[in-house]
UniProtKB/Swiss-Prot annotation:
Outcome of swapping residue 22 to A: Has no overall effect on Cu(+)-bridged heterodimer formation with ATP7A
Protein name: Copper transport protein ATOX1
UniProt xrefs under PROSITE patterns: HMA_1 (PS01047), HMA_2 (PS50846)
GO molecular function per UniProt: ATPase binding; copper chaperone activity; copper ion binding; copper-dependent protein binding; cuprous ion binding; metallochaperone activity
InterPro entries for the chain: Copper_transport_ATOX1-like, Heavy-metal-associated_CS, HMA_dom, HMA_dom_sf
Top-level taxonomy: Eukaryota, Metazoa, Chordata, Craniata, Vertebrata
Organism expressing this protein natively: Homo sapiens (Human)
Length: 68
């Protein structure tokens, strides 16, 4: 399963919780949230576009960094 890395402008635990919420709702993902470095690594069969759109639902600035 591909691992995608995203930069997400998270500043606190609440931001990380919002990311967890939208990813859990999407389903079919395994993820790691690196709050200090503002990165989210997602292992999923979903397309990068789907994952990016899902992360943007948090209202945070999100950018795709590439495959890990």
């Amino acid at each position: 399963m591909p691992k995608h890395e995203f930069s997400v402008d998270m500043t606190c635990g609440g931001c990380a919780e919002a990311v967890s919420r939208v990813l859990n709702k999407l389903g079919g993902v395994k993820y790691d949230i690196d709050l200090p470095n503002k990165k989210v690594c997602i292992e999923s069969e979903h397309s990068m576009d789907t994952l990016l759109a899902t992360l943007k639902k948090t209202g945070k600035t999100v950018s795709y960094l590439g495959l890990e």
